[in-house]
Curated annotation (Swiss-Prot):
<dbReference type="Pfam" id="PF18317">
    <property type="entry name" value="SDH_C"/>
</dbReference>
<dbReference type="InterPro" id="IPR001381">
    <property type="entry name" value="DHquinase_I"/>
</dbReference>
<dbReference type="InterPro" id="IPR046346">
    <property type="entry name" value="Aminoacid_DH-like_N_sf"/>
</dbReference>
<dbReference type="Pfam" id="PF01202">
    <property type="entry name" value="SKI"/>
</dbReference>
<comment type="similarity">
    <text>In the 2nd section; belongs to the type-I 3-dehydroquinase family.</text>
</comment>
<dbReference type="GO" id="GO:0009423">
    <property type="term" value="P:chorismate biosynthetic process"/>
</dbReference>
<dbReference type="InterPro" id="IPR041121">
    <property type="entry name" value="SDH_C"/>
</dbReference>
<dbReference type="InterPro" id="IPR027417">
    <property type="entry name" value="P-loop_NTPase"/>
</dbReference>
<dbReference type="GO" id="GO:0000122">
    <property type="term" value="P:negative regulation of transcription by RNA polymerase II"/>
</dbReference>
<protein>
    <recommendedName>
        <fullName>Quinate repressor protein</fullName>
    </recommendedName>
</protein>
<dbReference type="Pfam" id="PF01488">
    <property type="entry name" value="Shikimate_DH"/>
</dbReference>
<dbReference type="InterPro" id="IPR006151">
    <property type="entry name" value="Shikm_DH/Glu-tRNA_Rdtase"/>
</dbReference>
<comment type="function">
    <text>Multi-domain repressor protein that negatively regulates transcription of the quinate utilization pathway genes. May mediate its repressor activity by binding directly to the qutA activator protein.</text>
</comment>
<dbReference type="InterPro" id="IPR013708">
    <property type="entry name" value="Shikimate_DH-bd_N"/>
</dbReference>
<dbReference type="InterPro" id="IPR031322">
    <property type="entry name" value="Shikimate/glucono_kinase"/>
</dbReference>
<feature type="compositionally biased region" description="Polar residues">
    <location>
        <begin position="31"/>
        <end position="43"/>
    </location>
</feature>
<dbReference type="GO" id="GO:0003866">
    <property type="term" value="F:3-phosphoshikimate 1-carboxyvinyltransferase activity"/>
</dbReference>
Length: 901
């Protein structure tokens, strides 16, 4: 029996201070019951809240060292719940877990986003029986309670098959509930919510850590045996645990001003991160594509499958490194297209014992923490052998299967299956993959006699295809330089096979194989810079993204390109510094410069340059340039303005395909493609600042200040997010009415996000107007008017009328100005932070739209933190006096860590 589920032997005396239900759990386990035996786990373990935790950013403080003696286990393959994880789109979702894991909060978030009802199982029991569980137990015999419990549970699940989020407490996972949940999980997502010991102990207000630890060890296998998915609620620390500065006698007026100007971490930020993580997890794990597109950021590369792009990279990180070190996860992922988590932890030296008992929770915690800090897909890869570099020990079939199946519970975008295992093992994995894509992996430690020409490799590829893999990854150590040319021939050989073929990742490992890694087109494993010292150990790659990219440009596969910001007055632009820093860290020899012109004709200079890669478009040419375009993105066409131009070098075939193939390649320009990323930056900032209490619903109201190009982008961002009631105020009413008519004429029902055609746009004619009585107060405000003096026009010094900001739950205000940064509007909103208002300014929006432009220009992921840092540094150098506050800017960056969207 695997230690993953084997109950620790306990004496009954160990449980003397636990309540009767806890003692029953320990006694039953002590008598040898397996994880699949129905066990009573209900308990009233003190008072608790279901609130989620607080925030600590993206620094990875190795919380798993504490887990090593604190949490539970994997469930044996024969006891674990195996389902296909394919669900009808409207299937109700069940959340289970012990008290204090945050189930109720997560249910509310999920229901608000999906438009579903929350059903609390305990309240349902009380409604059906007229008694709460505790009272019913006291008034009836145990057998009567069990009988009634079974009836109520069956009724609960049968009555709520669709469009509900069902929250089950410990009482629902007793004897009868386990069986019914396992049956329900065949057609519905049943998600086990997990949390760390310290947070659970805090919420339960339990003093004895050891007793809570024992209960977690025992309850884990039970909950896993009747659920098909698992979400680890990562508790963040450092905010709620700290005394507020406002409570200190040293809190000065200067402190108050800095606090207002750096107010990005509002009290709801911890909930916001949790909300984003959980909604993304549910969309991924259930295969809800429309909701997934809504949860993912609208960056261009999110819309393209990785396997369809050229020269993509997977940052490869062993879980052992994350468990043992304080790691900056965002730095590890920077510019990569995927994050590969290698499960390389060693098993116990016995096939019977399998792996360590705490491993399941460590893996779940690691996956959740990594996901919090990345925006790219995750590849979950279990090493087939442990200690691979010294006396390798192959995992047992059961151990390998347990680890991979546990990974599938976590809903990774990709999971690998090792093709060295038997078909019977691999079929179990592939049959339960759900929405995850499967990469068939095969790594030779000793190359076959004929190397890549050996028929064995094609046979392995065909076997992976027959098993149902979505991609194939093959690798062997290089013994000569010629092996690098041989693997190229092998990839070509696969392409020439008849019928549709799977994407192939094929390369040589080791120092001699680095050349093949540079030219492998799909998901080349790369090592993050911070792990270079470990290159060649733990089976890590031997090349970084920067080295791979530099090799492609040095060998003339790709060309150095020139990019610009084009406008009438662009000397103040922060974009050149931001993009040039990004090119450098990515290993690209590109240059981004200012090109200023008093007329639109200045664009001719750009398009005559064969190395022209694209340009940002500034005022006043965002609309003037449209007649010159060969094509436009749907976003730019709807907005009626362009801020990004990309050259077209081939007019044959689809424009999208031509643009993808021509990125980073020089040549004559045949046309121009226009896009708009302003709306992306605005939309991301709205989502970042909008609290869970203000989740977008049909009744949500948005307000636009201004009627220019940025106001157009702001309206489009709101529609894309699903806002159905939008108001415009502009000093010139006629321009506001013209803008409203523009969008009311459009049919945006095919919008890629959660937007719909059922929106209405109204014009407010005066700042003295009361807010319309038939509409809720706005919770989203976007200001697109300049805050500085223009010509003879004085700075507007705009502030919102008090009667327009009476939302009881606050909201978010995005001011697109950053000249100056601390506008009257921003000061007004920051002074209302205690009422739930969040303020974001132009320096929040600018890098976000810049990330999207970088992707459009290069087809590669942007180094987000670096670009943000450069923007703030450049702003510091341009601004004088008190406008720039170094402490404020540092706080701004820290608050954005762990906020990929």
């Amino acid at each position: 029996m695997s230690i993953l589920v084997r109950p620790p032997k306990r004496r009954l005396a160990d449980t003397e201070n636990l309540d009767q239900n806890h003692r029953r759990v320990l006694r039953d386990f002590g008598q040898g019951n397996s994880a699949s035996t129905p066990i009573n786990t209900s308990a009233d373990y003190g008072r608790f809240d279901e609130r989620p935790g607080s925030g600590d950013g993206s620094r990875y403080a190795s919380p798993f060292q504490e887990l090593s003696s604190s949490q539970g286990s994997l469930t044996r393959v024969e006891d674990s719940l195996q389902t296909r994880r394919k669900f009808p789109p409207n299937a109700s979702i069940v959340l289970i877990g012990i008290r204090g894991t945050g189930k109720s909060s997560l249910a509310v978030m999920l229901a608000a986003s999906y438009g579903r009802r929350v059903i609390e199982a305990d309240l349902y029991f009380q409604r059906v029986t007229g008694r709460c569980r505790g009272v019913y137990k006291r008034e009836h015999t145990l057998s009567e309670y069990r009988r009634q419990e079974a009836i109520v549970m069956e009724s609960l699940l049968m009555e709520h098959q669709e469009n509900c989020v069902i929250v089950c407490g410990p009482g629902d996972v007793e004897r009868n509930g386990q069986m019914r949940l396992r049956e329900y999980a065949k057609t519905h997502p049943v998600i086990h919510i997990v949390r760390d010991l310290e947070s659970i102990q805090s919420y339960l207000k339990a003093r004895d850590t050891e007793k809570v630890r024992r209960f977690l060890e025992l309850s884990g296998p039970i909950y896993r045996s009747c659920s098909n998915l698992e979400f680890f609620n990562v508790s963040e620390k450092g905010i709620s645990d700290q005394p507020s500065a406002k409570d200190s006698q040293h809190y000065t007026q200067w402190d108050a001003e800095v606090d207002q100007r750096t107010q990005t971490t509002t009290p709801f930020l911890m909930l916001k991160r949790l909300q984003r993580d959980f909604l993304r997890f549910v969309a991924l794990a259930t295969g809800n594509i429309p909701e997934l597109r809504n949860q993912l950021s609208p960056f261009p590369l999110h819309m393209q499958p990785i396997e369809s792009r050229k020269f993509t990279y997977a940052a490869t990180v062993p879980i052992s490194h994350l468990l043992e070190n304080d790691v900056d996860i965002e730095e590890l992922e920077s510019t990569a297209d995927a994050f590969e988590l290698k499960i390389d932890v060693s098993a116990a030296p016995s096939a019977r014992l399998g792996t360590e008992s705490n491993l399941a929770d460590s893996i779940s915690h690691t996956v959740a923490t990594v996901r919090r800090n990345i925006i790219v897909p995750m590849i979950y890869h279990v090493e087939s052998s442990v200690f691979p570099d010294s006396a390798p020990l192959r995992r047992s079939d059961a151990s390998y299967l347990e680890l991979v199946l546990h990974g599938l519970r976590l809903g990774p975008e990709f999971v690998t299956v090792d093709l060295s295992f038997e078909d019977s093992i691999l079929s179990q994995i592939i049959g339960t993959k759900g929405s995850s894509k499967v990469i068939g992996h095969y790594s030779q430690t000793q190359p076959p006699p004929q190397g890549w020409s050996d028929p064995e490799y094609e046979a392995i590829y065909e076997r992976a295809k027959k098993l149902g893999c979505d991609m194939v990854r093959l690798t062997q150590p290089a013994t000569t330089i010629d092996d690098n040319f041989a693997v190229e021939r092998f990839r070509h050989q696969i392409k020439t096979l008849p019928g549709p073929q799977l994407p192939v990742i094929a390369y040589n490992s080791g120092p001699l194989g680095r050349q093949s890694c540079c030219f492998n087109p799909v998901l080349t494993p790369v090592i993050p810079r911070s792990l270079i010292s470990q290159s060649g150990t733990k089976g890590l790659p031997s090349i970084t993204i920067q080295e791979a990219q530099e090799a492609l440009y040095s060998s003339f596969v790709l060309d150095p390109m020139q990019f610009f910001v084009f406008g009438a007055n662009t000397t103040y632009s922060l974009s050149p510094a931001m993009h040039n820093a990004a090119f450098k860290v990515r290993g690209m020899p590109h240059i981004y410069r200012i090109h200023q012109s008093p007329t639109l004709r200045g664009i001719n200079y750009l398009v005559e340059n064969p190395n022209f890669g694209g340009t940002s478009v500034s005022l006043p040419y965002k609309t003037e340039v449209i007649p010159l375009l060969h094509s436009m993105s749907p976003h730019a066409r709807a907005i009626g303005a362009v801020n990004t131009l990309i050259p077209i070098r081939n007019l044959e075939g689809s424009t999208d395909n031509a643009l993808d193939l021509e990125k980073n390649r020089a040549g004559p320009i045949k046309g121009l493609h226009g896009d708009n990323t302003d709306w992306i930056g605005i939309g991301i900032c709205i989502r970042r600042g909008l609290s869970p209490a203000n989740a977008i619903r049909p009744s949500t109201t948005g307000l636009i200040i201004g009627a220019g190009g940025m106001a157009r982008a702001g309206i489009y961002a709101m529609i894309h997010l699903g806002v159905q009631n939008i108001f415009i105020w502009n000093r010139t009413v006629a321009n506001a009415e013209k803008l409203a008519q523009h969008y009311m004429r459009l049919n945006l029902c095919t919008l890629g996000g959660s937007g719909s055609a059922s929106y209405t746009i109204h014009v407010l004619k005066s700042l003295q107007e009361s807010w319309p009585a038939n509409y809720k107060q706005p919770t989203i405000v976007v200001s697109g008017i300049p805050a500085h003096r223009i010509g003879d026009q004085p700075a507007p010094n705009f502030q919102l009328p008090p009667q327009w900001i009476e939302s009881p739950t606050g909201g978010v205000v995005v001011d697109l100005a950053y000249k100056p940064l601390n506008t009257p509007l921003m000061r007004q909103i920051r002074s209302l932070s205690h009422r739930g208002w969040a303020a974001l300014d132009g320096l929040d929006v600018l890098p976000e739209q810049g990330f999207a432009q970088f992707e459009l220009f290069t087809g590669c992921r942007a180094p987000r933190r670096l670009m943000r840092t450069v923007i703030l540094q450049e702003y510091k150098e341009e601004e004088q006096g008190e406008e720039y506050d170094q402490s404020a800017m540092r706080t701004r960056l820290e608050n954005l860590d762990g906020q990929p969207m």
